[in-house]
Structures are given as C-alpha cells and as structure tokens.
C-alpha cells in the first residue's frame, strides 16, 4: 500500500530518473504502469494537464498583457509551476479587460426593452433598460458621482458641495417636479414631488365643561381613545381646531352660554350634553346658534344621566370614527343630525275618519240585531188569531196561551225579556234622536219614511221601516 500513498514530489523525481532524455514525462502516458499511475491526486493531475494543453494566447491579449510589466518569477517545475500559474491568473484580470469584453459583446447582443403604448418600433435598442446580464457594466463608483476623480477636484468646490448638502438636508418644495423619460421613443411626463410633511388628522373629540371629568370616568374604557379632556382656557385656537369635534358638558345654563361662545369661535362641530331638567333652556341656546350657522350639531341634545341615550351616542361616534379613519368620509358631521325618535306619533286624519265610520257601523248593526231578537221573542210568547169576516173588518181574537199552567221560572224569564226589550227600545230611540240632530241625511230619510208610512194601514210596518232606515 506504500506505493499508492507516495509523495507527488518523490514520484516525479523517480520518473525523471527513469526517463532516458531527462525531460519531464507526461503523467497520463500509457508507458507508465497502471499500478504507478493510481494515486489519490490522479484526477487533479488530469485537470492540470488539460490546463497545460490550453490554446496559445491571442494577439489582442498578448498586446494587453505586454503593456503591463510583470515581475520576473523564478522558473518552477512540476506542480509548483502549475499551481503558481493558476493562482496568479485571476490577479492579472483588470477592470479594463471586463469593460473591453462588454464593449465587444454589445455588437452581437440582441437587446430586449420594455414596450409602452407610445412605442412606434419594437426593434429599437435600449441598452440602459435592458434586463440582460450581459449588458451590465462595471463603472467606477467615483466617476459615476463626479465628472472626474475626487482627488482632481478643487478643495473649494468640494467644500461648497458639502456645505450645500448640510445646509438643506430636509428642505422640501411642493412646487418642485421631476421629469422622467421612459424610453427614447416615448413621451416624457411630469411627476409632481410628493410631500409627507402634513400628517392625516386623527379622529379625536375634546370634552370641555365642569362635569367633563365625571363624564369621562363614567364611559367605558373602550371609548376612552376617542376623547380627550382639557381646559378651554389653556388651549390655543390652533390646538382646538385640530380636534374633530368638541363635546360641551353643560353644568349651568348661564356658564354654558359663555363656554359655547368660546368653543364655537374656533370649532363649529358641537356635541351637546346637558343635565336633567335643562333640556328646554339648552335647546333654545343651541337653536339660536345653529340658526346663525355658528355651530353644527353632530348629534342631538343628550341628557348625561340617561345611560341608554349616552350609549347610543358613543356607538354613533365609534362608527363615525371608523369611517373617518378608513377614508369613507372626510368631514365629521357630514351626516344629517340624528333626531330623537318620539314615542307618541301624530294620528293622521284618515285614521280618525275610519275609526268614526267603524264605530257608527258597529252600533247600527248591534241595535238592529237586538231589535230583531226582541221581536222574535215576543212573537213566541203569544199568538194572535186573526179572522177576516169581510174585506173591511178585522177582528182580533183573544190571546191563546201556549201552556195553561205556567211555571215560576218561565214567568221570570218572560219579565226579564220584556225589560230587555224596553231597554233596547229606549236606546234605539235615543240613538235615533242623536243621529237626527247630528246628520241632515238621517233627518231627511226619517221625513221620507213618515210620509211613506202614513199611507200604510198596518201598525207593525213603522217599526220595521224604522229599523231598515237605521241599517241604511
């Protein structure tokens, strides 16, 4: 196994001694036995032999390398010379060689550009916008910023350039524009320079008034982020104008009027909250200011002790803040003012007329049914025997009772029915008098009925006819 792990230098010396001419033998020749060529470095030696057999350098590269003076290197033999040539080869590459290769490859490279709607030709080359890696150049960083090397610049001009950058580090001009050209064949457009100095206004409501702290403590903590409690005397007009709205908590009507005047001068979006019993006075003050367009009510007047109304107010403000933060509404109070829903609704005149008609019809039907029932009951209690002796004479016979012997219960029932019948007749007569005095059509119908009934000889017809008139 020792012959397979021999040192490469010893192996090369042994081969040099065995060679008759004293020249360096090739490592991959067939004259060397197989057991002598098998070693760990055989694959690497084959690669080195291929590098030695490379083509001779071209004229262009020989001229380029001839201009650069190389230090004299001692001649080495075997593996040392090969390793040194490989290690020194990458150091001999200069930036000029890379740029020369790129300039030579530009002629044969097919350019690919970005097409736009204003392009007239698709084959126009554009080397700056081409995404190909072969088009990538290696410019010097100093020459890309300055027109000449930094050490060639004068000290005064460099100092002026640095001072100008230090003097205006964050100066921005909104009127400044940037002109960009997409391609050589495309039209240029003007892009305005955006400014991020002004930040978007955050939805926040200022609470003022003596009971402001108590109101702020009573509301849930989830709504605290929307409010801020401060004193009006310590606020400048600019700070008060930053708030989306101002919630005025009225303690006393006299002090509330002065407080409302201070707030309305700088912020017109008002949310009014008063104490119980002050609704009429505070509403008069608010109406006076709203008619003169000095304030704008975001929500209707709310009582501080009414927890349900306060909860509805907080929910409304929460939804309003969500819409403002999301950008759906740009101004607080753009909605219409929410008005309190009244529990008592005004009755329309149509409903009133319909109710009177229904009541009159129901009373008429009830009286008519009662009269019919009383007539039927009276006819069953007694029967009349009528005999006609001649066409001009009518005789009424004696009443023939159904049963000769009456029980006390039947007698009591008959008296009760008679009493009900009399009561119904009295009610009917009084109702007729009321209707005759109230409505002219009923009076006219009664007059017609009397004239028509006066000609009739049967005494039972007037009652039936009067019932028909009432039903009509």
Curated annotation (Swiss-Prot):
CDD domains: psREC_Atg32 (cd19929)
Membrane disposition: Single-pass membrane protein
Biased composition (Basic and acidic residues): 58-68
Polar residues: compositionally biased ranges: 129-139
Gene Ontology CC, one term: vacuolar membrane
Chief location of this protein within or outside the cell: mitochondrion
GO biological process: autophagy
Keyword line: Autophagy, Membrane, Mitochondrion, Mitochondrion outer membrane, Transmembrane, Transmembrane helix, Vacuole
Function: Mitophagy-specific receptor that recruits the autophagic machinery to mitochondria and regulates selective degradation of mitochondria. Mitophagy contributes to regulate mitochondrial quantity and quality by eliminating the mitochondria to a basal level to fulfill cellular energy requirements and preventing excess ROS production. Recruits ATG11 to the surface of mitochondria. Also promotes autophagy-dependent peroxisome degradation.
Name of the protein: Autophagy-related protein 32
């Amino acid at each position: 196994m020792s012959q397979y792990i021999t040192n490469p230098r010893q192996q090369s010396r042994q081969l040099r001694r065995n060679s008759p001419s004293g020249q360096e033998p090739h490592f991959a020749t067939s004259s060397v036995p197989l057991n002598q060529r098998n070693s760990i470095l055989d694959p690497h030696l084959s690669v080195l032999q291929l590098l030695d057999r490379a083509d001779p350098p071209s004229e262009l590269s020989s001229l380029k390398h001839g201009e650069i003076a190389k230090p004299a290197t001692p001649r080495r033999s075997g593996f040392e010379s090969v390793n040194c040539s490989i290690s020194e080869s990458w150091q001999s590459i200069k930036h000029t060689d890379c740029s020369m290769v790129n300039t030579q490859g530009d002629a044969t490279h097919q350019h690919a550009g970005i097409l736009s709607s204003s392009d007239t030709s698709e084959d126009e080359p554009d080397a700056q916008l081409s995404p190909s890696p072969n088009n990538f150049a290696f410019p010097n960083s100093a020459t890309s910023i300055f027109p000449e090397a930094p050490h060639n610049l004068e000290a005064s001009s460099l100092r002026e350039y640095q001072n100008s950058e230090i003097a205006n580090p964050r100066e921005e001009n909104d009127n400044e524009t940037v002109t960009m050209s997409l391609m050589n064949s495309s039209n240029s457009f003007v892009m305005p320079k955006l400014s991020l100095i002004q930040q978007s206004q955050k939805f926040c409501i200022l609470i003022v008034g003596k009971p402001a702290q108590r109101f702020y403590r009573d509301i849930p903590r989830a709504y605290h982020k929307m409010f801020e409690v401060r004193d009006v005397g310590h606020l400048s007009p600019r700070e008060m104008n930053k708030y989306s709205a101002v919630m005025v908590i009225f303690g006393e009507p006299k002090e509330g009027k002065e407080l409302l005047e201070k707030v309305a001068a700088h912020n017109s979006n008002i949310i009014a909250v008063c104490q119980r019993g002050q609704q009429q006075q505070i509403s008069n003050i608010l109406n006076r200011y709203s008619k003169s367009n000095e304030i704008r009510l975001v929500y209707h007047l709310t009582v501080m002790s009414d927890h349900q109304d306060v909860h509805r107010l907080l929910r409304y403000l929460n939804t309003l803040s969500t819409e403002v933060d999301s950008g759906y509404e740009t101004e607080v109070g753009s909605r219409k003012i929410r008005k309190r829903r009244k529990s008592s609704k005004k009755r329309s005149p149509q409903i009133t007329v319909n109710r009177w008609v229904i009541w009159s019809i129901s009373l008429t039907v009830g009286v008519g049914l009662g009269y019919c029932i009383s007539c039927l009951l009276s006819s069953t209690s007694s029967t009349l025997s009528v005999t006609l002796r001649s066409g001009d004479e009518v005789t009424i016979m004696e009443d023939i009772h159904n049963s000769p012997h009456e029980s006390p219960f039947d007698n009591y029932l008959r008296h009760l029915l008679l009493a009900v019948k009399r009561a119904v007749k009295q009610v009917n007569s009084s109702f007729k008098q009321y209707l005759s005095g109230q409505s002219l059509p009923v009076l006219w119908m009664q007059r017609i009925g009397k004239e028509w009934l006066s000609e009739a000889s049967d005494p039972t017809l007037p009652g039936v006819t009067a019932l028909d008139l009432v039903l009509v």
